[in-house]
């Protein structure tokens, strides 16, 4: 029998219903795996006592035939989802000992359906990063290694801990957040399915904010079916979030294995020209186009003329929103406070924030403060908002002709820890293909579609119309079936 911690969410649900094993046994197998691979630094807070207590309650519910949809299923949560009574830090020194007195809506939704939380996962500080190297708890190491090198690789970011946990069989599923690609890019780097729903589908209540008009909860799983199961549990209108969409949660699981007949897939190949895209990624993109064509889809050449400005636009709008959101961390109400004798209030603010925030967060706060200043507002911020609307219009025009759009999730495979650390511009370009859909608030997923010449996973991205998670899953499922001969599993796990 497959090791319990290697079961998918769907297979775990089936096994628990059939009484092949108990939730306590399932959770125990995951705890052992976490303890075995602590060197990866995927978790920053382990909640094993809570998990075993929840597993015991799940076993009782199964015994009484009262099992809910996710009863007894182990998951992890990125450490920016507030968890009542459990430390939540956003992996920043400024919140290192913060314990919330309320629960985020997304984690509450999963708990209400029987999910069992194993712990909180590492991340880039305040979700600012593409490699999980800005955390105050240290780097996350990917479970994957290249076949020609034993060097430690990044898992992607900012949700790198969640990606490492699921890829390394330390959780069946894990919550992430996606602002400009922070679920899709790590999923691509670690051979997982990473899904970002339509902006507003999942409540942001209790999610520590980075950029409010872009942040959206997402999910990492090892199969497309698992994504559909978790999304059905996570999504839903929430009156506590003013940006929450009042729309019915669709039935998504029937999308798996659906026919591609009459589906039109848009491919903006021009976006790959002159970019930093690696040859392996280009080949994987072309191979996936052929796969979908052979599955019955019609491939349509499209253009997204303003998508190439996405990174520039994002790094004006997101830092602007971050500088506003992070102004609340002043040492007065909660979090870190740095004091010394005879210190003025202004000095206390300055010392607290300069000590509590890391270098990347400070960089983005300074950028954001400048673009919102009187000299930067017209020159940068308002222009960026105009181009954001043009990016969204490009997608609207494309979706008048196609049902989904196909793009790589990242321009490269995973790289070595420290390799690009000192060049923020190169690091920012990692989100070249994910940012446009974020600016437009569209549902999208990364699904494993191939391996590089060095044996590293490569993800393809499917972008759908607003609120059309169903067709994104449908295309993702077809791709998953077409590459099932490839084993997306790190060696030694």
Curated annotation (Swiss-Prot):
It catalyses: L-glutamyl-tRNA(Gln) + L-glutamine + ATP + H2O = L-glutaminyl-tRNA(Gln) + L-glutamate + ADP + phosphate + H(+). It is an enzyme of class 6 (ligase). This is Glutamyl-tRNA(Gln) amidotransferase subunit A. Its EC number is 6.3.5.7. Belongs to the amidase family. GatA subfamily. Transmembrane segments: none annotated. Keywords: ATP-binding, Ligase, Nucleotide-binding, Protein biosynthesis. Allows the formation of correctly charged Gln-tRNA(Gln) through the transamidation of misacylated Glu-tRNA(Gln) in organisms which lack glutaminyl-tRNA synthetase. The reaction takes place in the presence of glutamine and ATP through an activated gamma-phospho-Glu-tRNA(Gln). Gene3D superfamilies: Amidase signature (AS) domain. The gene is gatA. It comes from Rickettsia peacockii (strain Rustic). Heterotrimer of A, B and C subunits. Pfam families: Amidase. One of its GO terms (cellular component) is glutamyl-tRNA(Gln) amidotransferase complex. One of its GO terms (biological process) is translation. GO terms for molecular function: ATP binding; glutaminyl-tRNA synthase (glutamine-hydrolyzing) activity.
